[in-house]
Design a protein with these regions (language model features):
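Extracellular and organelle-lumenal recognition/adhesion modules and their flexible linkers in secreted
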Residues: 9, 13-44, 158, 183-414
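Alpha-helical segment of the N-proximal tetratricopeptide repeat
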Residues: 32-80, 90
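Alpha-helical repeat scaffolds
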Residues: 46-51, 76-82, 109-117, 143-152, ...
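Structural marker of alpha-solenoid helical repeat scaffolds
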Residues: 53, 87, 121, 155-156, ...
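Alpha-solenoid helical repeat scaffolds
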Residues: 62-63, 93-97, 113, 126-134, ...
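Residue at a conserved register position within TPR or TPR-like alpha-solenoid repeats
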Residues: 68, 102, 136, 167-171, ...
Length: 414
């Protein structure tokens, strides 16, 4: 009997841990690649295609919920938004859809809670903030409604007209409750502040609202700057709202109401127009505020006039009370006869002829140092604001005149 010879067996391939890991990495990479590949499809493909591609994706569920809500299928939208939130609890858009479905179903208190949460989570969720604006306005809660409106208008200039109209209508119809809220928003100096203030420029109601806001802001942390106040003053003046203009200046005291002539010494250019000197330049007329070459560090108004051109040299608005007043100023002549070629005039801002016209210096004066001249005039009862002007008295021949003015003032005659 022959001995059996053991034949060696076929060696088994041993799978080590490294090979298993590499297989796992490959599988993971395939899955990850698939997820990356379908992301654009889930975001941009038609909802019907996206839901077949990734039915469990929170993104797709949320898109489907939005689509159902837009189509008016409220129950489907509510169910899909809840499914999306179950998979992605912080999906603001899904939360907003759920809130809007509650509102469509008549459960506005529940909708208010949900959409408030959505609005707090994201300042960019415009539909949530828009719904909250409307809801809070119906409840008379201006503070909350305007806060959400502020959130909207900070981001989107295209809706400024609608939001501004909201502020304006509320301020016109319910000023006692809404104006302090609007003023509080403006006091934070939002990026839309200038645009809103500029929009209040057409109707008498808008102008009255602008005046009221100026007074409210003056007592707060962010009063109108000189540019904003100057814009308001000019708008009121051009719209013939003289009483409102006088009221605003008196209430906010800018420039100080006690000074009949603002910057009469020509040293303070900070006051807003039209209660500030406005100088005019044209051929034959040069007016500038420069340092006096006789009195060191003293600015004054220097006028170089050819005696032939006609026009206004300088002007500012005043609000003198009715009665008798005295005009005084200092003058220094370099050349010519300013009394014959220039005059200080006062006229009503609402129209009409000059109330007074005073020669701009002593008659037949010779070049010399500074001297004072004065004149008296009356302001009637129906003239709440006046233009103080330095004007030319042109003649048919040129007569060069160079003259300085300083310390221009108006005081009660008595």
């Amino acid at each position: 009997m022959r001995d059996k010879v053991d034949r060696p067996g076929v060696p088994r391939r041993r799978v080590d841990a490294g090979t298993i890991a590499s297989y796992g990495l490959i599988a993971g990479a395939v899955v990850l690649g698939w997820q990356i590949a379908i992301q654009p499809l889930m975001q941009r493909a038609p909802v019907e295609a996206a839901i077949r591609l990734a039915p469990g994706s929170p993104l797709v569920l949320r898109r489907s919920a939005e689509s159902e809500l837009a189509a008016g299928r409220v129950e489907n939208a509510a169910a899909l938004s809840r499914d999306a939130l179950a998979r992605s609890p912080f999906d603001v858009r899904a939360l907003r859809v759920l809130g809007l479905t509650e509102a469509r179903a008549g459960r506005e208190d529940e909708a208010d809670e949900i959409l408030t949460l959505a609005g707090n989570w994201s300042l960019r969720d415009d539909p949530a903030h828009a719904w909250l604006v409307e809801r809070r306005l119906r409840r008379g809660d201006y503070a909350s409604a305007f806060a959400h409106a502020d959130t909207l208008v900070r981001r989107r200039q295209d809706i400024q007209p609608q939001v501004f109209r909201l502020f304006t209508v509320a301020g016109t119809e319910d000023p006692q409750r809404s104006l302090p809220v609007t003023a509080s928003l403006l006091a934070a100096r939002p990026p839309w502040r200038g645009a809103y203030l500029s929009s209040l420029s057409q109707t008498p109601q808008e102008l009255q609202l602008a005046a009221s806001l100026a007074v409210l802001l003056e007592s707060g942390r962010a009063p109108l700057n000189n540019g904003e106040l100057q814009g308001l003053y000019w708008t009121l003046l051009r719209k013939d709202q003289i009483q409102a203009l006088s009221m605003v200046r008196e209430r906010i005291n800018r420039p100080p109401i006690g000074e009949a002539v603002t910057n009469g010494g020509f040293a303070d250019a900070a006051a807003p127009e039209p209660f500030q000197w406005r100088l005019f330049q044209k051929a034959g007329i040069v007016a500038e505020i420069v340092t006096d070459d006789l009195r060191s560090a003293n600015p004054a108004l220097r006028v170089d006039y050819d005696g032939y051109a006609a026009g206004t040299v300088a002007e500012q608005l005043t609000t003198l009370p009715p009665g008798a007043h005295r005009f005084t100023a200092e003058v220094r002549i370099e050349t010519g006869d300013p009394a014959a070629r220039l005059a200080w005039t006062l006229s009503c801002a609402a129209g009409g002829g000059a109330l007074a016209s005073l020669p701009a210096g002593p008659s037949n004066a010779t070049p010399d140092g500074w001297r004072t001249f004065s004149g008296r005039f009356e302001v009637p009862n129906n003239c709440p604001a006046q233009w103080l002007r330095l004007e030319t008295r042109a003649k048919d021949r040129r007569a060069p005149t160079v003259v300085w003015f300083d310390r221009v003032a108006i005081s009660p005659a008595n």
